[in-house]
Every structure is written in structure tokens, then in C-alpha cells.
Amino acid sequence: MESSNYNKTPLIVIVGPTASGKTSLAINLAEIYGGEIICADSRTVYKDMDIGTAKPSYEDCQRVPHWGIDLVYPYEYFSAAEFKQYSLKKIEDIRSRNKIPFLVGGTGLYIDAIVFDYKFGNKSDVKKRTLLEKLTIEELWEYCSKNNIELPDNYNNKRYVIRCIEQGGINNSRKVEINNNIIVVGISTDRDNL
């Protein structure tokens, strides 16, 4: 691939149930086509949590570079928004080196955040939330109206309205269409074989 074409390099997303062969497929394809793997799993991001997390083996990492592993300690906060930010930078980095990025998982929210370009709002402010929770639903609607905050679809649910306020009105966070230049491969396996 020419370096001027790296933005045209697709993101290959491989999804499927546990033990369906996602990782082995990704490794084989990445070896053949010159790719690197970003693990989209909410457990593998944690350091020192190697048991029960299906982290790639040392041998797998030697065959193909893997990213998204051992990013934070278990006592540290790590959100889907942070995963999205990390992954987008990593995808850009992989493409800039004329490699193909593979996003493999795992955790649906992590995958969807990239594929559907989720817009994450601000982190919740405990003091502000406490004040908002004391208001009636009608007072929350009035607050939204005065502050040009579009009400969520479920505007009768106080919790949804409060979260919408915290996010500054970003409540339609999921696009219906997949982002451009993404190829999604879904693996299905007979339940008896799992």
C-alpha cells in the first residue's frame, strides 16, 4: 500500500460469541494481509488480570501485534469512551504505518462505539447530579427548555433526563449506519459447539 492511501485502508471488525474463533481468524488474516489487532474486550484492558480474560498468548502477540491489552490497573476507571479514544488513535497509527487495523471482540459497547461513532457526553458530576435528582420531572423539563437541551426519547424517565442534562444534550449517541470504510465480519457458531 502506498502511504498516501493509508486513510483508504479499511478497519476490519470481527465479532462473535466467546470461543467462536474470532482471534484465530483475525491473526490469520492479519498475517496474510499485514495487519495489527486491537482487542475490543472490557476485561483484557486490565493489567494483572490474565486468568479468565482470554488475553492473546505471547506466541500470538509475536505473530501479530496486539493492542488494547493491559492498559490500566483493575482499580482504575476505564470507560467505553476512553476505549473509543484509545482505539481511534491506534487505528490512525496502524494505518499510518501502511498496516490494516483489525478490531476484534468481545465487548459490544466497545465495538459499537467505533462502528457507529458513539458520542459520549461528559462524566457525571456527583454534586450536580444530587441537585438534579431533587427536582421534579417537570422542573427537569423546564431546565432543559431554558438551556436548549433536547429531551431524550424517554423523556418521562427522570434518570434519562438527568443523564441527558449531564451530557449537555447529547442523547442521540448512536448512528444507524456504520461508519465509512469499515468491514464487519460476524462469526456465528452453533450453541452446541460453544
Locate the predicted segments by residue.
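Phosphate/pyrophosphate-binding catalytic cores of soluble transferases and nucleic-acid-acting enzymes
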Residues: 1-194
